[in-house]
UniProtKB/Swiss-Prot annotation:
It catalyses: 4-CDP-2-C-methyl-D-erythritol 2-phosphate = 2-C-methyl-D-erythritol 2,4-cyclic diphosphate + CMP. GO terms for biological process: isopentenyl diphosphate biosynthetic process, methylerythritol 4-phosphate pathway; terpenoid biosynthetic process. One of its GO terms (molecular function) is 2-C-methyl-D-erythritol 2,4-cyclodiphosphate synthase activity. Belongs to the IspF family. The record marks 35, 134 as: Transition state stabilizer. It is an enzyme of class 4 (lyase). It comes from Methylobacillus flagellatus (strain ATCC 51484 / DSM 6875 / VKM B-1610 / KT). InterPro entries: MECDP_synthase (IPR003526), MECDP_synthase_CS (IPR020555), MECDP_synthase_sf (IPR036571). This is 2-C-methyl-D-erythritol 2,4-cyclodiphosphate synthase. The keyword Isomerase does not apply.
Amino acid sequence: MIRVGNGFDVHQLVEGRPCIIGGVEIPFAKGLKGHSDADVLLHAVSDALLGAAALGDIGKHFPDTDERFKDADSRVLLRHVVALLKAKHYNIVNIDATIIAEAPKMAPHIARMVQHIAEDCDILADCVNVKATTSEKMGFVGRGEGIAAQAVCLIQKYQI
């Protein structure tokens, strides 16, 4: 059985927080606001994977009302999601993700983001694609108020 998942996340940019995207701390004057480390890319990827396996979303598994997830490393959360998929006998076929941001520039960091996602998902880097775009100065992203990310994944059930 082959299944597709789609994930989306958005976080506000604020002063006094690190800007962590795809598990990479990006030098920038602002960071993403959230209960965890607010890694918008890994949250979108996690939601896509959970959705593909019909396991709900990250809010269900890592609620922002639970202090255990305060400032949590989203790479740890992603690895937990992958363990849930493996428990249901799913392999990840591929992940394709898009970061939507006016700033900071993502291009210098994308290779490391891909590597982190591949490592955390236990798949080859060739199976992960991350790209970035802007919103052409429109909306909250265009005004530099936040960053969004979306992800799609393909998973496949394997025989045991």
